[in-house]
């Protein structure tokens, strides 16, 4: 069977840059699934994506599906015919489904009985006939949140479509895709190369598009070229380009023929906090800032043009003229904001609603101020500085700079606080209160910042849960999942002595009578413990290890983490599996007994050598391990408890627990309860698989 290269290119108007990669990857995944489901043999499925096109190139695509033999077993002969030998309705229905009559069916006979049988040789359908529907189906399944309609057509797609190229080898596959008749026509760059040309063979793609159309269709190639050229451009001016992955991806999705150029701005703008300048360059203009080796921002930026110009200086000058007013605005806002103290913005917070039922940003500020001070006292941070940071925490939201450049909230509070002469840890806390903003983000760097960051997040959690608006499904408008995980990360990774129980109770108390959910404290804690589950799963811990610790519901995050590490280590011990099984057995025995047990084991009632030995070791370990539990040395405790494997195994081998003698039975149950309690001081080991 011969094989050919298949090409599909959808020529469109400019596609959404932030969605370009996902559209292309989904197109490739969908089409690969179509090929596999159809049983079509194929080689590599390569995707291409540029601002005005999505394309796939499939190597070694078979010309047809393989022929196949099919067998369909019908009703048993006893049910297929009536007493007169006439076909039953069941038999006739089965035959119609196979496209035959009952008398055309074969018989299948085995030692288990006899049935009607349909056998057929099915010839594989040609690839050419299958491709149009496969392409259309793959496009219809793309993750497009909002479809467009254009012209008088009822066709919907992410952007208007102008060309559809379908080539199997050198042959055009006739089809109408997204309202466009397929052809071998491809459009090139808007301003360079040939605006439109024909492609003779699928194998010519994407090289022909580069040569004749001046378009680099390979997304990864464009991205790599931009990165390499930008690094070289920065090196030439003695700096390092800020090539963040997200911006690099976006710029690669905006250009078809990337040309990297270097421009500059006036040095006077460097007096403005670099974060505001960078926000303008990266967020608004899609420029790459350049830093000196000491980390200071240079008065230069790198940008990517979508054209090779005979006069690149004209393009450079144009971009410099575009960015200058934005930088001038930042300079003006910075100078204007500093004419008054940060604290002077407090009254204006009363005019901004935090949440309708929970009050204004000023109300939130007062709660954060009190909660940050309370947290600071618990963790040994400067209480005065923490309350001061809480008071100023939202003031920068009222500044001109943050109003215009919203992503500078926090960092501008830090700069304005420094200008006002606030303590350095207070200023830093204003910037770091929102950390961690995402997975892997840095944590607050000092105790005051930790107190403020936790206070801000806990106030939001308590408030939103307190009015019954907890996250449902994928919806989380107040980013409560991120807030909860942020609190847990700070407490665990900074090893802070905080208890979620008292922390949540204090956050709830500060709301007064505004909250309507009577179970808010438990709801918040359960939600946060649920975040622990997701966190530790991401860290590679097994689900049953997490469940074993969650079963004890430890509300001190640092303590929770210590238990997780202890149980994970315990699982590596030789005795772990046997003791987990024994704990499960003990748990089941105790659950089935409704008898009232004693507080302690009666040594005089012990009878068998195995129970005497086990009881003695339980008593010894109980006394020995008490300091371990008090100090949170759970790993050491479980290592010691692992020594119980032999006496526990011997006990269950030789001793019957549920004997008729009530005194003996209760004493043995009590001993098992004391044994289980030792393990439960760490986790429910019986849940380990």
Curated annotation (Swiss-Prot):
First-tier enzyme category under EC: ligase
Record keywords: Aminoacyl-tRNA synthetase, ATP-binding, Cytoplasm, Ligase, Nucleotide-binding, Protein biosynthesis
Cellular component, GO, one term: cytosol
Disulfide bridge positions per record: none
BP term (GO), one: glycyl-tRNA aminoacylation
InterPro entries assigned: DALR_anticod-bd, Gly-tRNA-synth_bsu, Gly-tRNA-synth_heterodimer
One function term, GO molecular function aspect: arginine-tRNA ligase activity
Enzyme Commission no: 6.1.1.14
Main location: cytoplasm
Reactions mediated catalytically: tRNA(Gly) + glycine + ATP = glycyl-tRNA(Gly) + AMP + diphosphate
Superkingdom in the source lineage: Bacteria
Subcellular location(s) per record: Cytoplasm
Known partners and oligomeric status: Tetramer of two alpha and two beta subunits.
Similarity-based family: Belongs to the class-II aminoacyl-tRNA synthetase family.
Name of this protein: Glycine--tRNA ligase beta subunit
Source species of the chain: Escherichia coli O8 (strain IAI1)
């Amino acid at each position: 069977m011969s094989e050919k290269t298949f090409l599909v290119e959808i020529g469109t108007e400019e596609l959404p840059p932030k969605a370009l990669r996902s559209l292309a990857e989904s197109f490739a995944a969908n089409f690969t699934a179509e090929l596999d489901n159809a049983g079509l043999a194929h080689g590599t499925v390569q995707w291409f994506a540029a601002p005005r096109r999505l394309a796939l190139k499939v190597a070694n695509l078979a010309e047809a599906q393989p022929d196949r033999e099919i067998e369909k077993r019908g009703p048993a002969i006893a049910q297929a015919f009536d007493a007169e030998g006439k076909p039953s309705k069941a038999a006739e229905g089965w035959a119609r489904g196979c496209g035959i009559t009952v008398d055309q069916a074969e018989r299948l006979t085995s030692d288990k009985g006899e049935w009607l049988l349909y056998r057929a040789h099915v010839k594989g359908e040609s690839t050419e006939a299958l491709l149009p529907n496969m392409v259309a189906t793959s496009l219809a399944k793309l993750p497009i949140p909002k479809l467009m309609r254009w012209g008088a057509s009822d066709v919907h797609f992410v952007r208007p479509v102008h060309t559809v190229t379908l080539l199997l080898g050198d042959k055009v596959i006739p089809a109408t895709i997204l309202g466009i008749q397929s052809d071998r026509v491809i459009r090139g760059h808007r301003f360079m190369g040939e605006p439109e040309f024909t492609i003779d063979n699928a194998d010519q793609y994407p090289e022909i598009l580069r040569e004749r159309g001046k378009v680099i269709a390979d997304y990864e190639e464009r991205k790599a070229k931009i990165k390499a050229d930008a690094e070289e451009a920065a090196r030439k001016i003695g700096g390092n380009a800020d090539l963040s992955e997200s911006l690099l991806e976006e710029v690669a999705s905006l250009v078809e023929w990337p040309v990297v150029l270097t421009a500059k701005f006036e040095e006077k703008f460097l007096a403005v906090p670099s974060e505001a300048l960078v926000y303008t360059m990266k967020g608004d203009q899609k420029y790459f800032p350049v830093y000196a080796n000491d980390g200071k921002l240079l008065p230069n930026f790198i940008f990517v043009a979508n054209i090779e110009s005979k006069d690149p200086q004209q393009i450079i000058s144009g971009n410099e003229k575009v960015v200058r007013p934005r930088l001038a605005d930042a300079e003006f806002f910075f100078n204007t904001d500093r004419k008054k103290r940060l604290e002077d913005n407090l009254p204006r917070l009363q005019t901004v609603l935090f949440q309708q039922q929970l009050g204004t940003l000023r109300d939130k500020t007062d709660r954060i101020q009190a909660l940050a001070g309370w947290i600071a006292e618990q963790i040994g941070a400067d209480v005065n500085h923490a309350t001061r940071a809480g008071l100023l925490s939202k003031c920068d939201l009222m500044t001109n700079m943050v109003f215009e450049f919203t992503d500078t909230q926090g960092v501008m509070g830090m700069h304005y606080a420094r200008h006002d002469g606030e303590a350095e840890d207070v200023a830093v806390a204003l910037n770091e209160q929102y950390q961690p903003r995402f997975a892997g983000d840095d944590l607050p760097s000092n105790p005051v910042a930790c107190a403020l960051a936790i206070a801000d997040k806990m106030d939001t959690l308590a408030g939103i849960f307190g009015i019954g608006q907890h996250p449902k499904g994928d919806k989380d408008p107040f980013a409560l999942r991120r807030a909860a995980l942020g609190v847990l990360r700070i407490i665990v990774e900074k090893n802070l002595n905080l208890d979620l129980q008292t922390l949540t109770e204090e956050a709830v108390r500060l709301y007064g009578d505004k909250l309507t959910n009577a179970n808010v404290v438990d709801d918040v804690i359960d939600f946060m413990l649920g975040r622990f589950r997701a966190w530790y799963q991401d860290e590679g811990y097994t689900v049953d290890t997490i469940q074993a610790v969650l079963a004890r519901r430890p509300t001190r995050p640092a303590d929770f983490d210590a238990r997780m590490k202890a149980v994970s280590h315990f699982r590596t011990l030789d005795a772990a599996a046997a003791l987990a099984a024994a704990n499960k057995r003990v748990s089941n025995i105790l659950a089935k007994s409704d008898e009232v047990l004693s507080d302690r084991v009666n040594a005089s009632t012990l009878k068998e050598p195995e129970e005497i030995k086990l009881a003695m070791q339980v008593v010894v370990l109980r006394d020995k391990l008490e300091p371990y539990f008090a100090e949170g040395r759970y790993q050491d405790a479980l290592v010691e408890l692992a020594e119980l494997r032999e006496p526990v195994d011997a006990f269950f081998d030789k001793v019957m627990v549920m004997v008729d003698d009530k005194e003996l039975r209760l004493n043995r149950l009590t001993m098992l309860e004391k044994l289980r309690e030792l393990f439960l001081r760490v986790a429910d080991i019986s849940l380990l698989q």
